[in-house]
């Protein structure tokens, strides 16, 4: 898998590349969380869930369905989240007047951005040189997919991340992940 740092780079790159204001600042945080969240499945190792299990590492949380669920949650949060620090009400932080209504555009925008951010995670993981692949089509298929081109070195888990192998992984991610962004 690429490191968690590289997964966070995708929403940051999208936000920076978009026309100013196209992706509001309040949406950046949820996008970064959505891009990193699938790797919370490493907790499966501590729970003795086998790697190859549907709920193991790179399993269900790396599916497009999971990205879709996060997108729906983002849309609901954007629509009903007035009064929250990053509410979609008029695409403004808490400064929006109480009479402002969330727009359909801001709700759809939240869903699309969060979906792209969450879906980027398994797509990047599928481009790595190791592991069992990603369960993109879960729950319809438990098949693990790899991209036909896999230039990114698989990231070691901590504490091995802070080693020569971890540095080689970061350089690989810089070359194949960050620079193209």
Which ranges hold each PLM region?
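N-terminal membrane-targeting hydrophobic helices
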Residues: 1-181
């Amino acid at each position: 898998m690429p490191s968690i740092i590289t997964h966070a780079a995708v929403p940051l790159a999208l936000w920076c590349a978009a026309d100013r204001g196209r992706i509001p600042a309040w949406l950046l945080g949820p996008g970064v969380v959505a891009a990193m969240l699938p790797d919370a499945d490493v907790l499966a190792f501590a729970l003795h869930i086998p790697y190859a299990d549907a709920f193991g590492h790179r399993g269900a949380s790396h599916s497009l369905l999971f990205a879709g669920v996060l997108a729906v949650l983002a849309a609901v949060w954007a629509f009903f989240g007035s009064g929250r620090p990053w509410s979609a009400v008029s695409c403004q932080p808490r400064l929006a007047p109480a009479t402002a209504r969330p727009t359909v555009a801001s709700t759809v925008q939240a869903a699309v951005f969060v979906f792209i951010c969450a879906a980027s995670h398994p797509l990047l993981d599928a481009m790595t040189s190791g592991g069992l692949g990603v369960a993109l089509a879960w729950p319809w298929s438990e098949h693990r997919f790899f991209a036909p081109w896999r230039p990114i070195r698989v990231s070691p888990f901590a504490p091995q991340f802070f080693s020569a192998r971890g540095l080689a992984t970061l350089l690989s991610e810089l070359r194949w992940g960050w620079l193209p962004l």
